[in-house]
Amino acid sequence: MIPPTSAQVTAEQNVLQTFFSHLGNFSYDKAKDHVEKEKEGNKSAGASWSLMLAALAHLAAAQKAYHSMSFLGQKQGGQLFFSRKDSIRTNYTSLYNELKKVVTTGRNAVGGTAPHLEELLSHLSEQLCYFVQAHMEIADFYEKMYTLSSQKFINAEELVKILEAILKKYSSRFHHPTLSPLESGFQLEVDVLAHLLKAQFLIYEWKFLPALVNLHNAHTKLQTWGQIFEKQKETKKHLFGGQSQKVAQPPHLFLWLMKFKNLLLAKFSFYFHEALSRQTSEMKTLTAKTNPDYFGKISSFIRKYDAVNVSLIYDTRGSENFQGHGYHHPDSYREAPKGMDQYPAVVSLPNDRPIMHWPNVIMIMTDKSADLNTLEKVVHFYDDKVQSTYFLTRPEPNFTIVVIFESKKSERDSHFTSFLNELSQSLKGSRAFASLKPGSKV
């Protein structure tokens, strides 16, 4: 590309850089106002520049709608409203067509009054077309995630593959230095989402260290993202004069990613409670602050209803290289578990798993596998020989929660079934996907 050298191009470049800087800081309204003011004050501008300014104003509006996730619909007064007319796909398609016009106009303006400017705008618009296409695909991806919230089990590994394919497709497609704020923001968002989905899958696979690494990476990148909002100030003008400033409210997408990370952290802290409890007291304090605090909820339930034990059982039969709690060297070898050891209690409260009850627990899991595999039923079993009652449910494949009482309890007792249903639903992760929709009470 011929480097733009004229004073005019420099002036236009300044407008563009300020616009993309605002957009990179998620200041959509400032970005939109900036180009609209330029358009209003420069009505004699050439065709390409006028088209570009109009397209950029629409880009700012589209990005605001995208980050607000309003295209998923919004609950208002109990009713679900979908703004089909203003759907993100319609907005982006219209914007794509506008940018294509700038590309064509710029290429046809050979020998015009500002060839360097025409070439720059054509080049930027071409790359922005890829940016728009990438966001259309990511918006579709979020819609897919939201749709999956109604499923009993979500295969996060499949989602990671789809997301990585999108990232690979558009990698380095909008690399112009002027667009670097957009490229950085896109990369940050997709990286955070990929880390979280990988962590979700790795927790399900019961892989401690890789899950921890992905959660940590997501946390670090969300902190970087959050600092952008902390630096943004919104000025509010008061009715009777005067004004005040407050930190800008992050968009729904960022808040949702934070929520998703916190839910995964809570699940991680529960599934790997044994390994984490061996850490420093500071680590214990940090994991106790998770929301929900599964350890705290279960401990309260045990005290209130005098349960002997609540365990999370991991069926290791389909797992490769199961090695037990904590860190393990990648090349270390451990013989595969056999017999009852194929069903370890990866979490057991208030103390170690009650070994005398384990044959019964495994028998119930085997006999009632069809009910448990529905991932929604609570199974009840009373053994009069040992005067003990067992309640079991399965939040996701390979994991079963069992509550043991050394007394007779009715299967109609809603205290126990409600507790297990709530615990199971919370661990599934489908609630996190459902809360992608703005206004969701999930």
Swiss-Prot record:
Keywords assigned: Lysosome, Membrane
GO biological process assignments: cellular response to amino acid starvation; cellular response to glucose starvation; negative regulation of TORC1 signaling; protein localization to lysosome
Keyword Membrane found: yes
Domain of life of the source: Eukaryota
Main location: membrane
Coiled-coil residues: none
Pfam families: C12orf66_like
GO cellular component: KICSTOR complex; lysosomal membrane
Compartments (UniProt record): Lysosome membrane
TM helices/strands, residue ranges: none
UniProt KW Membrane keyword: yes
PANTHER family hit by this protein: KICSTOR COMPLEX PROTEIN C12ORF66, KICSTOR SUBUNIT 2
Subunit field text: May be part of the KICSTOR complex.
Family: Belongs to the KICS2 family.
Role: As part of the KICSTOR complex may function in the amino acid-sensing branch of the TORC1 signaling pathway.
Name of this chain's protein: KICSTOR subunit 2
